[in-house]
């Protein structure tokens, strides 16, 4: 009996880290889905805000950048300020601040209230990204590439659902009550998170897990540039997509369907592009997806509404899937093995680019045409191809190590 009890105790001790790891990953994924859903759900409101507040394309992009730019610009300060805070506290704080921003936007405070609420919500999301990523890497150590892919994928689930729900509700409700409902959803997620996530991270080998390679600052710096351009393409196209659908005769509900199709394709693209990278390598897979992105974006300029809706899931695969390959490479190229700082820098690059790029593309459209703005976004993806080729000397050793780790991990 004593031997049996000892065996049960040993089994429980072995299973506890696995259970806690799954809880950590689930907590990070739920919060990531909410915040990414908040981020891209705002696209459904852009045509309404443009009409109500009489904004140009560039002005609309500036309003959008109040959220996106705040989220990107505060990545590093948020990472530094909350390094001594437990994962539960950091993710709860991120969610509650974002909820406060949506509550402010939902109040009848005019254009100034909308802008202030966007900034507050952006502050909350700036906390979530680096702290959620570090929670996953600390939990899984050297085997974090696959869980990071799951974490990255969870964001696309939020992108696929919240924008569609918002677009479906907007023909029925005014836009402020819809924002209020999104805030209520955030409170529900905060309650779930409070009972789910542990107060501390579950592994003590973060020093080992952080030092898994790293080809130097040159490789990491180029990776952040590539990530920024990839995000610029995506956010630039998303700026114009609602207006492209309206121009084809679609309504608000059709815009929601179009966004959902694009984001569902993007979620599927996370798995597809990781699979592709294992066969073509990171360099070959990124080159292929960026070339396809350029061609498909330009193709949507010449297709009717029905054909455009058919193309959007395919475009979503390559438009959004590339980021998963780039994101999974961050720990291997992290300067000095500091994955927390590396993720914060990478997010600053991609989110900052996502905030600035629509302003640039919007200005191009304002001074020429919407079509030229869309073409500019597509050509940005093509510009990534030679940069990825230049990344090869830095990326190859780290990527090989990561793939070996991923294939050997349970």
Description of each model-found segment:
Residues 183-205, 386-392:
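C-terminal membrane-cytosol helix-exit motif in multi-pass small-molecule transporters
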Residues 281-329:
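C-terminal transmembrane helical hairpin of 12-TM major facilitator-type secondary transporters
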Residues 117-155:
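Cytoplasmic helix-loop-helix junction between adjacent transmembrane helices
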Residues 40, 68-76, 160, 263-271, ...:
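Residue-level signature of mid-helix packing/kink "hotspots" within the transmembrane helices
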Residues 73-109:
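Conserved MFS/SLC helix-loop-helix module at the cytosolic interface between two early adjacent transmembrane helices
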Residues 42-43, 218-270:
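Extracytoplasmic gate region of multi-pass secondary transporters
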Residues 74-86, 269-281, 365-366:
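Helix-to-loop junctions at the C-terminal end of transmembrane segments
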Residues 337-367:
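A late C-terminal transmembrane helix in Major Facilitator Superfamily
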């Amino acid at each position: 009996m004593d031997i049996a009890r000892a065996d049960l105790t040993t089994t429980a001790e072995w299973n506890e880290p696995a259970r806690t790891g799954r809880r950590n990953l689930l907590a990070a994924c739920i919060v990531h889905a909410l915040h990414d859903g908040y981020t891209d759900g705002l696209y459904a409101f852009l045509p309404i805000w443009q009409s109500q507040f009489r904004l140009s394309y560039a002005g609309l992009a500036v309003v959008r950048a109040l959220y996106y730019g705040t989220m990107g610009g505060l990545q590093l300060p948020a990472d530094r300020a909350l390094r001594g805070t437990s994962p539960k506290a950091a993710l709860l704080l991120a969610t509650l601040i974002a909820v406060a921003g949506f509550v402010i936007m939902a109040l009848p405070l005019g254009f100034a209230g909308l802008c202030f609420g966007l900034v507050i919500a952006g502050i909350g999301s700036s906390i979530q990204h680096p702290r959620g990523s570090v929670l996953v890497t600390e939990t899984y150590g050297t085997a974090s590439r696959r869980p990071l892919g799951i974490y990255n994928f969870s964001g696309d689930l939020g992108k696929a659902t919240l924008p569609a729900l918002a677009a479906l509700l907007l023909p029925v409700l005014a836009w402020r009550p819809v924002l209020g409902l999104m805030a209520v959803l955030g409170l529900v997620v905060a309650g779930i998170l409070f009972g789910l996530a542990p107060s501390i991270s579950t592994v003590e080998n973060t020093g080992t897990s952080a030092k898994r390679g790293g080809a130097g600052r040159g490789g990491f710096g180029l990776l952040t540039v590539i990530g920024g351009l990839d995000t610029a393409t995506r956010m630039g196209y998303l700026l114009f997509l609602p207006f492209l659908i309206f121009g084809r005769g679609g309504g608000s509900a059709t815009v929601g369907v179009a966004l959902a199709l694009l984001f569902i394709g993007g979620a599927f693209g996370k798995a597809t592009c990781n699979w592709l990278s294992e066969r073509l390598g990171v360099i070959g897979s990124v080159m292929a997806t960026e070339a396809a992105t350029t061609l498909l974006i330009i193709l949507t300029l010449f297709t009717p509404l029905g054909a455009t809706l058919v193309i959007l899931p395919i475009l979503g695969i390559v438009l959004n899937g590339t980021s998963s390959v780039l994101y999974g490479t961050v720990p291997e190229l992290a300067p000095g093995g500091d994955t927390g700082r590396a993720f914060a820098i990478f997010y600053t690059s991609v989110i900052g680019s996502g905030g600035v790029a629509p302003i640039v593309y919007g200005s191009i459209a304002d001074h020429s045409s919407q079509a030229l703005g869309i073409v500019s976004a597509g050509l940005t993806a093509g510009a990534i191809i030679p940069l990825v080729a230049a990344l090869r000397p830095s990326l190859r050793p780290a990527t090989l190590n990561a793939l070996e780790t991923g294939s050997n991990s349970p």
